[in-house]
Amino acid sequence: MAKKIIGFIKLQIPAGKANPSPPVGPALGQRGLNIMEFCKAFNAQTQALEPGLPTPVVITAFADKSFTFVLKTPPATVLIKKAAKIDKGSSKPHTDKVGKITRAQAEDIAKTKMPDLTAADLDAAVRTIAGSARSMGITVEGV
């Protein structure tokens, strides 16, 4: 018989930098999960990613105090800001443009995000990324 699920915990943790301090410790502690075990497993799985890149994770907590977790792809906004080499998006996105990315950069981001997007194909994913970029005040050339 399958284990009884007692909840899901969604967190965004910098790659390779999970530690017992908030937000990780309190979120896992409430469910009675082993915090250090999660931190070690998360850091081991995110070694290949760029250190410090915010990585969403969904933790499934079971009644016997065990857990599993699934890593998601980094948020599109983080990848777009990195591609445009800016720190933050525009405060007035449709009037003040703060940067630009090319279609090739948008395609790279779309390929990275593809497992988490609902887009049917790469072209639809590129349009989704372009829309996110536009709402941040970033111009996408060639889309």
Swiss-Prot record:
The keyword Amino-acid biosynthesis does not apply. GO terms for biological process: translation. InterPro entries: Ribosomal_uL11, Ribosomal_uL11_bac-typ, Ribosomal_uL11_C, Ribosomal_uL11_C_sf, Ribosomal_uL11_CS, Ribosomal_uL11_N, Ribosomal_uL11_N_sf. One or more lysine residues are methylated. GO terms for molecular function: large ribosomal subunit rRNA binding; structural constituent of ribosome. Keywords: Methylation, Ribonucleoprotein, Ribosomal protein, RNA-binding, rRNA-binding. One of its GO terms (cellular component) is cytosolic large ribosomal subunit. NCBIfam families: L11_bact. PANTHER family: 60S RIBOSOMAL PROTEIN L12, LARGE RIBOSOMAL SUBUNIT PROTEIN UL11M. Part of the ribosomal stalk of the 50S ribosomal subunit. Interacts with L10 and the large rRNA to form the base of the stalk. L10 forms an elongated spine to which L12 dimers bind in a sequential fashion forming a multimeric L10(L12)X complex. Belongs to the universal ribosomal protein uL11 family. Forms part of the ribosomal stalk which helps the ribosome interact with GTP-bound translation factors. This is Large ribosomal subunit protein uL11. It comes from Paraburkholderia phytofirmans (strain DSM 17436 / LMG 22146 / PsJN) (Burkholderia phytofirmans).
